[in-house]
Amino acid sequence: VYVRRSNDIMKDRERSNLWQVSSNGDDHRPLYSGLKSARTPRWAPDGKKLAFVSNDSGSQQIHVRWVDNGETALISQLLESPSSLSWSPDGKWLAFTMNVKASSESIAKPRTQPKGASWAKKAITVTTTQYQYDGQGIVEPAYRHVFVIPADGGSARQLTEGNFNHYGSLAWSQDSNRIFFSA
C-alpha cells in the first residue's frame, strides 16, 4: 500500500489516497480514495487490517480497514493529528505520536482593558519559529508525545510527557510490552 498524492485545482488543496500494488508491480488500484485525504498506512501484523490516518470524519483521526471485506472503522477521537502509527506485534494496540499543547509564558503583562473601551485584537506573541506548512498562521507551542490506543478503538493513553519532542518511528518489543523511540 502506498500514498498517492494529487492536487485539486478547484479547491487549491492537496489530496492523498491509499493505493495498493501487487508484489510484481503490475496491478495498481485504489484501496481507500475519495474527496478527503488518507496517509500513514500501516499493515497489522497478521496482514488482515490496515491502519491509517484520514480526515474523513472532519479532523485527522485513526481508521482501521479490514482488507477482506473493505469495511473501515474510525477508532479514535483525538484533539490533534496523529502520526508515526505502529502496530504492536500481537495486533492489539496502535502506538502513535501526537502534539500536546504546551503552556506559553508571556514576555509582557498586558494592560487591563478599560470598561467600555473598544480595542483591536490582542497581539500574538511568537516565542518559537514554527509556522503552519500551508503558510496560514503560527503553530501553537506544543510537544510531540507517544500515545497508545486499542486497535479496536477506545481512549488513547499518553505514555510520555515533558518539554521535548518524540519524532520518527516507533518500534515495539516482540512481547508487545515496550515501545522504543528516540527523543
Where are these regions (language model features)?
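Conserved beta-propeller blade repeats
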Residues: 1-3, 33-53, 71-72, 79-97, ...
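Predominantly five- to eight-bladed beta-propeller fold
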Residues: 14-17, 99-147
